[in-house]
Amino acid sequence: MKKMSNIYESAANTLGIFNSPCLTKVELRVACKGISDRDALSKPDPCVILKMQSHGQWFEVDRTEVIRTCINPVYSKLFTVDFYFEEVQRLRFEVHDISSNHNGLKEADFLGGMECTLGQIVSQRKLSKSLLKHGNTAGKSSITVIAEELSGNDDYVELAFNARKLDDKDFFSKSDPFLEIFRMNDDATQQLVHRTEVVMNNLSPAWKSFKVSVNSLCSGDPDRRLKCIVWDWDSNGKHDFIGEFTSTFKEMRGAMEGKQVQWECINPKYKAKKKNYKNSGMVILNQCKIHKMHSFLDYIMGGCQIQFTVAIDFTASNGDPRNSCSLHYIHPYQPNEYLKALVAVGEICQDYDSDKMFPAFGFGARIPPEYTVSHDFAINFNEDNPECAGIQGVVEAYQSCLPKLQLYGPTNIAPIIQKVAKSASEETNTKEASQYFILLILTDGVITDMADTREAIVHASHLPMSVIIVGVGNADFSDMQMLDGDDGILRSPKGEPVLRDIVQFVPFRNFKHASPAALAKSVLAEVPNQVVDYYNGKGIKPKCSSEVYESSRTLAP
């Protein structure tokens, strides 16, 4: 087990040293049940302290209020933490009995603790575990932590305006009206939110519907004032003012469900000068639709599972595993690059898979008993059930299969992409956000079936699937960069472009002198966006409804 512990330590021993942008913030609600005090005659005054691990050390992040004489506390204090999918964020919840005379921990009694990762909490949305004290359960006491995403309003709104009987500003034709909408900021400035197209020669125009984010429209404040101005377009750029009105997003929402909202378009100068002035026309909002933009955590908390699959290169270019120069050499204490990459990425993905069973395949080797070449064999040699129990199970299957293989070639990865794509394709039949597939391919050389691989990736880009390729060793991987769509659009040999960028390629040597956690951050940082892009693009909502979210706030353990 010393070997495994070294692998895990090297995979996650440097957290918090990177400055990547935070994906989102998460609120954690805490409750405890059945807390027991050392003094059986009195009830404790419990407080929960949240600690986070960084560089192998635990640091206090925040603490709840103290609830006096209570064995089943439900805390009102929320913990707010930054969430990074691409990191293992280790948390420790400690329950202390805080004396009424002291707030320091030296005088407090430690009542129990619980360790987990933030990924485990958000993937389950409600995590309940027994409190442990010195490695043993602290009586029947337990702690429950509920996660809720704290994010800005990412929804967008679709609006459709028309006007009626606008003032005519042209001598030889009718006005050419367009509409501008401005957000009134707190500092009294105005921010243009949208400008419609010009409708030529028409006093009762119907402008095309348009979409704008709620944040852009009103900064998330439905009562923020909006100024709407109607202009008569002129080719010289000196547009004529027709009229204006003010509204709010709250008022505009009155045009939902087939209703209309209308405003008088007023020219203040005309209103001041003309006694019989009524208005310069009417502006009507015919449609107000609010479109929900779901986040990565919406899908994860809604029950979407990350299905993690690994594929390992067993071609002869890796070298004889019995030789210490081989990329597959099993050192008694130092994990090889294949193991480092596998554990670094797999340790993060496993938090989002409830059964912790991971299919693991190999390619490029001759396998027993006939020793024919295979490019998608199960490394546990059980083709009917290629799954391994946890990342440790994958590591053990890898170490066990090495002596039984004949490393061969070529380096073909299209078959393994197609195998996982088949499972992802079956998932699309559910029409739900149930499973998203991540395929980790570990290879030591440039692939030899580039055309077939491009075809497979283009097909997979239409499925709930992402592909991560890690180049192991010192080969020239420059040709592999074309699979990563960052520098351009990947196309199949027939010219069909990928629907979305699903491939991330990195050479392991770029992280040789950094923690494997840095490798995981690099290859997994784009996964949340890829998940959201797929499901939002398909119009698939998270399985969990808003009502379930509300009910999840019930903190009874």
Swiss-Prot record:
Q: Which UniProt keywords apply?
A: Calcium, Metal-binding, Repeat
InterPro entries xrefs:
C2_dom, C2_domain_sf, C2B_Copine, Copine, Copine_C, VWF_A, vWFA_dom_sf
Write one Pfam family the protein is assigned to.
Answer: C2
Q: Which molecular function terms from Gene Ontology are attached?
A: calcium-dependent phospholipid binding; metal ion binding
* Cofactor(s) this protein cannot do without: Ca(2+)
Q: Which GO terms describe its cellular component?
A: glutamatergic synapse; synapse
State the source organism's domain of life. Answer: Eukaryota
Q: Where is the VWFA domain?
A: 305-507
Q: List the disulfide bonds.
A: none
The entry's Ca(2+) 1-binding residues are D170, D176, D232, D234
**Binding of Ca(2+) 2, residues:** D170, D232, D234, D240
Q: Which residues form the C2 domain?
A: 3-131, 137-264
- Homology family: Belongs to the copine family.
The cross-references to PANTHER family, in alphabetical order and at most eight, read: COPINE, COPINE-4
Q: What does this protein do?
A: Probable calcium-dependent phospholipid-binding protein that may play a role in calcium-mediated intracellular processes.
| Quaternary structure note | Interacts (via VWFA domain) with ACTB, BCOR, BICD2, CCDC22, CDC42BPB, CEP162, MYCBP2, NONO, PDCD6, PITPNM2, RDX, SKIL, SKT, SPTBN1, UBE2O and WTAP.
The identity of this protein, by name, is Copine-4
